[in-house]
Amino acid sequence: MIDFSKTITDFRSHVPGIRDWAYFETGSTGLVPDFVYEGVRRYMDDRYYKGGDSLWAYEDETVSTLFMHQRSKEALAEMVHCKPSEIAFGLSSTQLFTLVTEGIDYAEDDNIVTVRKGWIGSRFAWQKREAEGLEIRYVEPEDGRMTAERIAARCDEHTRAVSVNLVESNTGYRLDMDALGRFCAEKNILLYVDGVQALGALEVNVEKWNVDFLVGNDYKWMMNFCGTGYAYMSPKVQKRIRHWGAGWMSDKDRFNTAKDRLDLRADAGRFEIGHQHNDGIYGLGLVAMQNNLLGLSNIESYVCGLADYFCGRVEETEGIRLSYDFPRKNRCQIVVVKLEKSLQVSEKDFEEAKVCAPIGSLDENGEREMRISLHYYNNREDIDRFFAVLKKGV
């Protein structure tokens, strides 16, 4: 019943939004594949016309809502290399991230090490704690680079946690998680990771990297509608989070309304509290299943190959250059470029060519920046269409 794609090249046919447009804005908001749209619509139609808790369809069976939650957790767990019991759902990646900023009691002499110019969601969450007296140590990037060594240099015996972004949203810099994970494990420092700009496009292995806490969302690389986040929580972190709220979804026996006392679940689901955004959880699970079917190593190789092709076109094109020159191991599916002052091209030119690639404002040098996001529904022809627009402005 779910029409998954068997190959990466065939997947493009499942995304109507890419049929007419060359779409490069997934780093902001991704496109939605047909099997997510149709699956959610089936549920909506059943709720609208029939009422009740309608069933969720899969290739092999239809299941009720709580079983659907479990199947989505199983797919996401396979995608990030953890156990389904270590996955929890929430309103967003940022809301879930506050479980470790607000839910863990840090001692008076503890400090947290994080990135100065990282994504504002987690950075603002730490700044709130900083205003309340917790010491937050910021690591300055150098030419857009944030190495494990620079982060380690800011840590000491009082560092309780390191908080990073796997891929930096504004630069496309990919952190060396092997090195950082080893350091944190050796020093017994908790490792918190925002994986939003990587999950669904790159290989992520929380076990190999010694990650303690990881958050992701639904509407970028996971190709869903907005409103659902998910988190991996290691058993160590689950034990340390102070449970400041509970509800019927937190209980071991979720439909026993005759119970007098709460009996908290032993897994990460105890943090879910109440009814979740079921459409989003279903869609997340479907995309995780699609990713697992294709293989994240194959997906990463494909999207990074597109990025290499894009960078090669940049080198041979006048009026455009790469904003950052990162080592290969730190590159990913996001490429940031500068449009030089001499290049006469506008967003209208891109729109008329049906190329979705927003242009930033003029900087002090009269140049404009563009962030190009390459998903596995993109191909080289999309990239060629982008450069055909630039060629007219030279």
What is each model feature region?
Residues 1-394:
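Pyridoxal 5′-phosphate
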